[in-house]
């Protein structure tokens, strides 16, 4: 129950942040300025720039704290030993004959690889949210446009992760397992 609730909160908050982020993008597009490609209204949340920012910055806290709680939970229960990519997984991918073991190794590799992307998304988001207070963080990204571009690029990477995570979950346990993640 607890992990399923966290899982659902992460997915819902990600979708809300993506759609509100697209509203922010429409106000000042990252690629091509104000004449750049515009996201269709139906794919955005917030109605205008300030509304998009309100949604984005509110949900950002839900997302970040949910990830933090999940991280603490994984650490305290020592589930990280089974969740993250290890030497045994590398061996299974290189020479392993057991297809299920290889699938789980791929799953852990994908699961582990999203961590730096999420840190980058949160770090770049915080740098834009409070650039004066977190000037040291903002400076790590060289300039404002680079910061915005990096933050924006974490979205398709996260979407790709969700898609691959979903497909691998279906391959490992079928639709029944995947559906069970959303039943409390």
Feature annotation, model-predicted:
Residues 1-184:
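Membrane-embedded alpha-helical bundles that constitute the cytochrome b-like, heme-associated redox core
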